[in-house]
């Protein structure tokens, strides 16, 4: 029986529990590579798998979680050795049973760009290697993922190199976000669009704490939902998890009414947990839940549901824009970012991105623009090109669920574009034109809209993901056909039930007082059912029209949005004076405009003391970003971009100081290290970035750092503040030993500890001076310690 049949025939599918917990019980050394045991201790693995099978597991995960080329370097085995050995061990354990074997794949352990340095295609290649090596598995499971972009690379690697079923589970925190800020809705929309077989959550929390996460996920998908919780929460002092097998099963039972189909255990669980889970599920019926998933698009952190008029900003397009064309030819990405940020502040919900211009490599520029935009803004993008190759490159580079602009009713367009929309799980704008051009009548445009819808459904694209553009013709040239456009919008909306799109500004080409024409055409189209006006949101009367329409039609309940924008005193824009640079530098930093920020810094240095720029502009901008991050209004990718922009300013200042012969003053030296036996350093690296941008000299000792190395470095470099990180309960003892050795050697220092498994109580228990729950708190501690 294969996985897909298993899902259809069984009420519930039972997974196994933790592998690491079991290997540690058998004697896995701290800091050892679990995947090396596939070859060195195969009998251990066979025994563990058999214990889970006997407990009731329908599927066991092969011991391949960290079997990628980077993590295996330490033990000397290759992917091609470790993965087949793991699958063979699992197969041996499954003999005589119907138990399936999953190729278990975890995160690479490096951040992808724009947050990190690993490229999408590099990540793809790493996953491809694992998938090819695990071809003999029954299904592929990607688990414990926190970055949706990395997971997309993994899924594409699987779908393009294997026919095996795909299961994806991400790790969410109690704030309903992953470590990188991924929203549950964005995860569901993106992964279901990519065509995986099941999605869910694993790790981080116990079944009780995961309930609200699972509840939200079950509202956003019709795929089978997988839940693999931890055995509660770990006690960092005892390394024990606080949820017993009986309580685990009891809390898991409460997930059943939500529609959960697949259940297992993660960290801290063992065969006894799976046995209790299987006993609880015996005789119970799966609760089938069908959701009407709305028309929506998303970035990783933000989902836009098309349940009311939403503004698509039109300004990222070179047509008729001399300055934009110059920016494209000069490869000036900051100009594009500036246009994006300006539109979002003005009220755009989605941004159209078109970089088509003779004389440039449109494919390369589109990819560059998409990546840069997603590093700075969180609204979804509409990918706009007439060239299928450009669209595919943009779709591959995009993180989330975008809109494709566009397909039309020509057979060649349908054949070239719709397969891409289906493969990458996008929504699509259908233009009501064919080889004969734009029909004059509303009836013919309606027919073309229906053709596009029918073809999309044939390709397996959801009806909700098809948006129709009935095409705005210029009133100056075809005044008699203006009403044909709005009448077509009305029919498409009411008779086909599709979302509608119009390029509003086209109506007024060639006419005086264009704003008046645009404003009235927009209101007319909205009353006929326009959902997605493509327009210039920077023109206040246009965004005001949309807001007023929402108020008058009771979409904006109690006029909350309208009053928030127009109820207070009118804000006046700052005067365009010589002080503009001082006003704009914090803005440039906060919005991730690196080139503009660096240029403004250089200009300010001609008239302002370097340290005044740092203390009065750079640090406050970073503080503001940090505060927004703590409130959950800003997420890790944007925080890193802000820090990177500040770093560009610091580099300008540093070079200026060197050129003048002055001595750069450090705010203080700090050692950072991930403790012995722990190979996870993503969190520590983020702390490093922020500390450096606040002006501290960071000595980064890396990961898996020996206790004595920390002591020696502190003494040799006269460092008085040390930060230690641990991400695994098994390496907490290394953190304790490092602190102990520093104290025994009378090193004059204060110690900060942090990491996913560290708590304030544990910090106090081992004699650390400070506990930092995140990177921003590490900065706050450093500032307090150094008095700056």
Model-derived segments and spans:
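Domain-level signal for soluble alpha/beta catalytic cores
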Residues: 1-467, 473-788
